[in-house]
Curated annotation (Swiss-Prot):
Function: mRNA decapping enzyme that specifically removes the nicotinamide adenine dinucleotide (NAD) cap from a subset of mRNAs by hydrolyzing the diphosphate linkage to produce nicotinamide mononucleotide (NMN) and 5' monophosphate mRNA. The NAD-cap is present at the 5'-end of some RNAs; in contrast to the canonical N7 methylguanosine (m7G) cap, the NAD cap promotes mRNA decay. Mediates the hydrolysis of some nucleoside diphosphate derivatives.
Any one biological process term the GO annotation gives: NADP catabolic process
Family matches, as InterPro entries: NudC-like_C, NUDIX_hydrolase-like_dom_sf, NUDIX_hydrolase_CS, NUDIX_hydrolase_dom
Residues that coordinate or bind substrate: Y207, A243, G244, F245, E259, E263, E307
Domain Nudix hydrolase: 208-336
GO terms assigned for molecular function: metal ion binding; NAD+ diphosphatase activity; NADH pyrophosphatase activity; RNA NAD-cap (NMN-forming) hydrolase activity
EC number(s) per entry: 3.6.1.-, 3.6.1.22
Motif (Nudix box): 244-265
Keyword Transcription regulation: no
UniProt-recorded name of the protein: NAD-capped RNA hydrolase ndx-9
Length: 374
């Protein structure tokens, strides 16, 4: 059943539609989130709003973004435009492969923003048609281009865009996995919003989950050196901060301290949380929570070979040079190719990553490392 507060919001929304002189610019944040809450749990209401919605699109897990670089943004389309364009390529969408992302203001009321994800069929092996070329043509017809989700997350400048993409990918993947009740194995009825699923037998309700991750920039007591790591299998020459998943029963500070010990084999003297976090949808949904830690620079580094290729202390000047290179080459087109050069600091993660923001603040002298001991 809808909550009382949600019913009030919906009544107000209907009134606004009836008397169009009232602008949604006067609708506050509370009204917006209560409307979203109503849409999340009321399938019939969301179904009636679907034809009025705006949508962003993924095809074969590739996101439709603007052609402009480096200011990458998701392309938003009206329901009718997207339906027509996809229909020309034999593609369809409906609520079953769409998820609710946000509520957008119009001059009259608020409309839903959906993400819709489509899997395109592969052409026959002997077909002269190239699927890659078809997707390129589709992207052009929709006013954009398709790109890898990870690259989109790393290069989008706007936090709202990155967070919406993280939500889009996370809900889409969760809805594709949660088909059976983990308790009784009966079928689950997925909400149209993809915000939850209810067991048809035991009525247990399941919600999308995410895993908390600590990401920590380690500095020395002088705050003039930072310890950065290169993950096994990552792009050559790219160094980042230490990160790892929290375990049951751990605080985030305890998680950060343990991950540092596991991955680089040193102890930290102090650690504090930064007012920074980032949803990250790959490979599974997580929330990265930023910390800064202080460790003595004379400790012997012992990397975990299963996780890392190398970990090194760098001066502020060295890290600043890598930051400058990254800003000049945000798509990492000039990555080093030789094995030795891959182990040298050339880049930090692109601007869309929380690690970039942490490292950049430290380079600019805005990240102090003093605080309480663990």
């Amino acid at each position: 059943m809808p909550t009382f507060r949600s019913n009030i919001v919906v009544f107000n929304l209907i009134a606004r539609r009836a008397f169009t002189t009232t602008s949604t610019k006067n609708m506050g944040f509370v009204e917006k989130v209560r409307l979203l809450d109503y849409w999340k749990i009321q399938d019939s209401a969301l179904q009636s709003e679907f034809p009025r919605s705006r949508l962003v699109l993924m095809v074969d897990r590739r996101l439709l973004v603007t052609k402009d670089q480096p200011d990458v943004q998701m392309v938003e389309l009206s329901f009718d435009d997207l339906k027509q364009r996809l229909g020309e390529y034999g593609l369809q969408f409906d609520l079953s492969n769409s998820c609710l992302l946000d509520a957008l203001s119009t001059d009259v009321d608020m409309i839903p923003l959906f993400g819709t994800s489509i899997d395109a069929a592969d052409p026959p092996e002997d077909s002269p048609i190239s699927k890659k070329e078809v997707l390129k043509q589709l992207g052009n017809s929709l006013g954009g281009r398709f790109t890898d989700i990870r690259m989109a997350m790393l290069t989008m400048r706007e936090e709202r865009q990155r967070n919406l993409l993280a939500k889009f990918q996370s809900l889409t993947k969760w809805a594709s996995i949660y088909r059976r009740c983990p308790k009784c194995a009966a079928a689950l009825k997925m909400r149209s919003s993809k915000s939850g699923a209810e067991c048809v037998t035991c009525q247990r309700v399941y919600y999308p989950t995410f895993s908390p991750v600590s990401i920590t920039l380690i500095t020395d007591p002088t705050n003039e050196h930072a310890l950065l790591v290169r993950h096994r299998g990552s792009a050559g020459g790219v160094f980042t901060a230490v990160a790892g998943f929290a375990h049951s029963g751990e605080s985030m500070a305890e998680c950060a301290r343990r991950e540092i010990a596991e991955e680089v084999g040193i102890e930290v003297d102090s650690i504090r949380s930064l007012d920074m976090s980032q949803p990250w949808p790959m490979p599974d949904s997580s929330l990265m929570i930023a910390h800064v830690a202080v460790a003595k620079i004379d400790q012997k580094i012992s990397v975990c070979p299963d996780e890392l290729e190398t970990a090194q202390w760098f001066t502020r000047h060295q890290v600043k040079e890598a930051l400058t290179t990254t800003l000049a080459d945000p798509l990492l087109k000039n990555l080093p190719r030789t094995l030795d050069d891959r182990q040298t600091l050339h880049y930090i993660p692109p601007a869309g990553a929380i690690a970039h923001q942490m490292i950049r603040q430290w380079v600019d002298g805005k990240l102090e490392n003093h605080n309480s001991r663990i």
